[in-house]
């Protein structure tokens, strides 16, 4: 089954797939698309990848994100996995290359997807047939319900005002018994992190910061079930069965 056939199996009926470049496809309309991160993809990666930035600003480490992604990847032996808002696969490329699962990784930024492709090639020599890179909009999900065994959405919710609407839509893409893995920055009384969250909110980078308790309540209200939830510094890590 080629890439187009694999994508048609999970995309909603009538959704048109376009091949943009080698190993990159799009489910967006055939119109010019400019995304905020197209202009800053390289700068974003160079900062966010560092131990110093994560430790100082958020009280975390890049290894925390890699470990969380690995937990999502090994949560099912072979089922299909969706990475929603995948960025450049900064913390996930090595995890996906080490897995045998089919992974569909989507982001609205074409430049981020190009960096994801380059990262996979640099680390693995090529983009495996089972890893599909798709340009798609998180605000307008184009996937069929019940098509994924695992869904990972890392570092997205703090940029998404309509999280209460998004979370159940993501959950609906999972098969019965599927697993949802989410991370988000939250305010929690940590001075440096909370101040920086406020700055990013005022500059329009993030939505209004949610507190750790607020996010936990939101997840429990929208998913309607027990959520495994923990915080490290300003980062919340949540897992839920659906």
Regions found by a protein language model. Name each.
Residues 2-19:
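Short acidic, Pro/Gly- and aromatic-enriched capping/linker segments at domain boundaries
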Residues 16-75, 94:
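Conserved class I S-adenosyl-L-methionine
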Residues 82-140:
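Class I SAM-dependent methyltransferase SAM/SAH-binding core
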Residues 152:
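A conserved beta-strand element that flanks and buttresses the S-adenosyl-L-methionine
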Residues 155-156:
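Short catalytic micro-motifs in class I SAM-dependent methyltransferases
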Residues 164-176:
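A short glycine-rich, Lys/Arg-flanked "PGG" loop and its adjoining helix->strand segment in the class I
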Residues 181-236:
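C-terminal alpha-helical "lid/dimerization" subdomain adjacent to the S-adenosyl-L-methionine
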Residues 238-242:
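C-terminal lobe and adjacent flexible extensions of AdoMet/dcAdoMet transferase-like proteins
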């Amino acid at each position: 089954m080629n890439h187009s056939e694999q994508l048609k199996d999970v995309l909603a009926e009538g959704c048109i797939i376009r091949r943009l470049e080698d190993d990159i496809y799009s489910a967006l309309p055939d119109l010019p698309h400019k995304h905020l991160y197209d202009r800053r993809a390289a700068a974003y990666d160079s900062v966010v990848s560092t131990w110093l930035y994560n430790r100082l600003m958020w009280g975390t480490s890049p290894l925390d994100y890699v470990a969380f992604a690995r937990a999502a990847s090994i949560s099912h032996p072979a089922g299909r996995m969706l990475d929603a808002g995948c960025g450049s696969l900064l913390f996930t490329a090595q995890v996906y290359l080490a897995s045998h699962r089919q992974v569909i990784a989507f982001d609205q930024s074409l430049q981020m997807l190009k960096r994801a492709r380059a990262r996979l090639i640099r680390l693995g020599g090529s983009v495996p047939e089972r890893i599909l890179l798709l340009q798609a909009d998180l605000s307008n999900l184009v996937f069929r319900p019940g098509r994924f065994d695992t869904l990972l959405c890392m570092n997205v919710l703090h940029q998404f005002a309509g999280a209460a609407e998004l979370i159940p839509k993501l959950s609906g893409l999972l098969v019965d018994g599927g697993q949802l893995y989410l991370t988000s920055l939250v305010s929690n009384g940590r001075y440096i992190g909370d101040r920086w969250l406020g700055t990013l909110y005022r500059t329009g980078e993030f939505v209004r910061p949610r507190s750790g308790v607020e996010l936990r309540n939101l997840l429990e209200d929208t998913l309607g079930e027990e959520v495994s939830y923990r915080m490290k510094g300003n980062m919340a890590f949540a897992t839920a069965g659906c």
